[in-house]
Amino acid sequence: MMWGAGSSMAWFSAGSGSVNVSSVDPVEEPTGPATLLPSPRAWDVVLCISGTLVSCENALVVAIIVGTPAFRAPMFLLVGSLAVADLLAGLGLVLHFAADFCIGSPEMSLMLVGVLAMAFTASIGSLLAITVDRYLSLYNALTYYSETTVTRTYVMLALVWVGALGLGLVPVLAWNCRDGLTTCGVVYPLSKNHLVVLAIAFFMVFGIMLQLYAQICRIVCRHAQQIALQRHLLPASHYVATRKGIATLAVVLGAFAACWLPFTVYCLLGDADSPRLYTYLTLLPATYNSMINPVIYAFRNQDVQKVLWAICCCCSTSKIPFRSRSPSDV
């Protein structure tokens, strides 16, 4: 999609070589009033389908959080921010497909590249904010539920979305390679230098998340040991509970790394002459991160599951008993 030159993503080829600025093989200028639109390739269709699934999943999460008054706690605000970002990413993929292969508008395609850059940045930023919130809820357990927590949540969300908006506007307003394809990176029309900056920012975020989750593991192990001693539980019970908690954190961080690390590394190593196939193969898992985020951060929550069951049964959600849950449960 956004990695095709000109008005489309279809300067893709299975091997390396010079960049083709047209969407298909060179053709004569059209003699009629109609504009020749490129034909989508299999990878383009797969990404469009992925965008549709991402949009549907996250639209459901947004609808649940907005439509359920009980979901106004800071942790649900952060999950809602993540869902909105992933929803924009899914819609951006679908609309970019339409802009390239149905409308043929280079200007619309460029704007949607900015939307995708903003959405994916906001998604990663929201994941970092959720990690920070989880850590603080355990580190400052006694003072977590206060007005300060709400204020801090809004500040984090503001920083995430302002930063994402800035990074999304950069390729639209100035920093792109539409006028100089030799400066392009693996994703058109983002320049190589721009992608390097984004990759470095990702590694910084990933490093912070890794450090915070390591601290969370230490706190969880210490708390589990203290509870086991107070309740005179067997050591086996302590280790089982601790191992389960650490396994959950490993799944959360591992899914994030598996989805984004291949594409980020490829952005650093590749350039405009790199095989287009590798761009698709590394970018597709990155879109899957927006597909699994609702499962990890929303649908696993028991209160969200209650609302889903109520919706499926056409029942009112106003009488559903919700229990107080900490961010580490989300």
Curated annotation (Swiss-Prot):
BP terms from Gene Ontology: positive regulation of cold-induced thermogenesis; regulation of meiotic nuclear division
Keyword match Phosphoprotein: yes
Residue intervals passing through the bilayer: 43-62, 75-98, 111-132, 154-173, 199-217, 246-272, 278-299
Keywords, comma-separated and alphabetical: Cell membrane, G-protein coupled receptor, Glycoprotein, Lipoprotein, Membrane, Palmitate, Phosphoprotein, Receptor, Transducer, Transmembrane, Transmembrane helix
Domain of life: Eukaryota
First-listed, main subcellular location of the protein, grouped into a coarse class: membrane
Organ and tissue specificity: Expressed in both the forebrain and hindbrain, with the highest level in habenula. Lower level expression in the testis. Expressed in several metabolically active peripheral tissues, although at lower levels than in the central nervous system (CNS).
GO CC annotations, alphabetized: plasma membrane
Glycoprotein recorded as keyword: yes
Job of this protein: Constitutively active G-protein coupled receptor that maintains high 3'-5'-cyclic adenosine monophosphate (cAMP) levels that a plays a role in serveral processes including meiotic arrest in oocytes or neuronal development via activation of numerous intracellular signaling pathways. Acts as an essential activator of thermogenic adipocytes and drives thermogenesis via its intrinsic G(s)-coupling activity without the requirement of a ligand. Has a potential role in modulating a number of brain functions, including behavioral responses to stress, amyloid-beta peptide generation in neurons.
Protein name: G-protein coupled receptor 3
Organism of derivation: Mus musculus (Mouse)
Gene behind the chain: Gpr3
